[in-house]
Regions:
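Short, structured coil/loop segments at alpha-helix boundaries
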Residues: 9, 30, 98-99, 291-292, ...
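An amphipathic, basic-hydrophobic helix/alpha-beta surface used to engage anionic
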Residues: 42-286
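Extracellular/lumenal glycan-associated context and N-glycosylation machinery
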Residues: 1-61
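Exposed, interaction-prone extracellular/peripheral surfaces
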Residues: 2, 200-397
Length: 397
């Protein structure tokens, strides 16, 4: 954060003019120039003291209209500042925003409404700090300025965008059977359950994300959640070799893959499937079992994922009963790796790659994969895969 100079351009000019007047008065013996120089210097010093001496302190609270900010979504931030000072200063305020969030977070102080509000738009997923609040004041002559930070920062979570996807051509369940829906699972809403504080050892599946966001500490659901095998599995391949090396800017291909991961999981859950979302190392990123809070938990986890490490064998990742729909999302895929990729008995395996190298699609198809190239438009890639599945035996419902 760049610190402002104590003098404005006008103030610096006045100080330079004062020095020049004093020098000229000595050279030419002109007393009036000496008076002018001393007056400018005194005025600059007075302005500097008037701005810098008053003691100010205060607290800042921020309220965001949405618990989670989605990429491309616009939300509103309300800032309340309790300022303690001898007199209310007049100036300009601005809230410091990270590059991952866009918005016009500034205006005149004090505001007419008594509170500060501004819109923000999610640009890049992740957990980012908002603040601190900066207040800039200038003396009446415009010679000196002061910029002071108030309050602490607040974290905001930007989650991947979820797109509407076309329905599957046919409903399939575990091991190719009919997909089943548990009415007890889908009938419950996590918001109807009383959350409690997190205790070491609690399952991450039971974290109540909305209550956590509201209270600022980890909260979990109190009910005993039954463990069950998923009807569908979504795998996000985070292997470092599949993606570009991390840099200052986000990898567009990986961001698209994360967004498809979220979209596919939410879509399958909306069709009645219980869904597990895992990465290529076997880490559980989310489990959608019909609770209203499951979606938020998945999106929060996906907000923080990045390419890393190496992947494991897909059959070892899934284990147990093969799922019905299996969605595998990867980056750069060559023919050799595609030939080793087996769907582990899944009834409806779909493979999405952001960069299919020559021969990769042909090597994966004989194993039962429906292969689609994942481009910028996620819905189109999904529709291509769903349409292709009709050609390999699925019957439209």
């Amino acid at each position: 954060m760049r610190r402002r100079r104590p003098l404005t351009v006008r103030g610096a000019g006045a100080l330079v003019a004062a020095v020049c007047c004093v020098i000229a008065a000595n050279v030419f013996g002109t007393r009036i120039l000496l008076y002018i120089g001393l007056l400018l210097a005194a005025l600059t010093l007075f302005s500097l003291l008037a701005v810098r001496l008053p003691r100010r302190s205060g607290t800042v609270t921020r309220q965001i209209s949405t618990d989670l900010l989605t990429v491309s979504e616009t939300s509103r931030v309300t800032v309340r500042i309790s300022l303690r000072a001898l007199r209310v200063p007049h100036g300009l305020w601005h809230d410091i925003l990270p590059a991952a969030v866009a918005g016009d977070s500034g205006g005149e102080y004090p505001p007419e409404s008594g509170q500060l509000t501004y819109p923000i738009t999610g640009v890049r997923r992740g957990v980012w700090p908002l603040g601190p609040l900066m207040l800039r004041t200038v003396d009446p002559f415009g010679l000196a300025q002061r910029e002071q930070a108030f309050g602490e920062t607040r974290s905001i979570t930007v989650v991947p965008e979820v797109f509407a996807l076309a329905p599957l051509a046919v409903r399939v369940g575990a091991a190719g059977g009919t997909a089943h829906t548990s009415s007890t699972r889908l009938g419950q809403g996590s918001d109807n359950l009383s959350p409690r504080g997190y205790i070491p050892g609690d399952s991450m599946r039971r974290i109540h994300w909305r209550a956590t966001a509201h209270r600022g500490q980890l909260m979990v659901r109190q009910e005993e959640e039954e463990e069950s095998s998923p009807d569908a599995v979504v795998v996000l391949d985070r292997s470092a070799g599949r993606w570009d090396a991390p840099g200052a800017d986000a990898d567009p291909a990986f961001e698209t893959a994360v967004s498809l991961c979220a979209s596919a999981a939410v879509h399958l859950a909306s069709e009645g499937y219980s869904v597990d979302v895992i990465d290529s190392a076997g880490t559980l990123l989310g489990a959608l079992r019909g609770h209203e809070d499951d979606r938020d938990g998945l999106l929060v986890a996906l907000a923080m994922v990045a390419p890393r490490g190496e992947g494991r064998d897909l059959a070892a990742l899934i284990g147990g009963t093969p799922p019905g729909p299996l969605v595998f999302i990867t980056g750069r895929l060559d023919e050799e790796d595609a030939a080793r990729l087996r769907p582990a008995g899944a009834a409806a395996p779909m493979l999405f790659s952001t960069e299919l190298l020559p021969g990769a699609a042909e090597a994966a198809t004989p194993h039962g994969w429906t292969v689609a190239t994942l481009g910028p438009v996620i819905a189109d890639a999904w529709e291509d895969a769903v349409s292709a599945r009709i050609g390999v035996g699925d019957v439209p419902r």
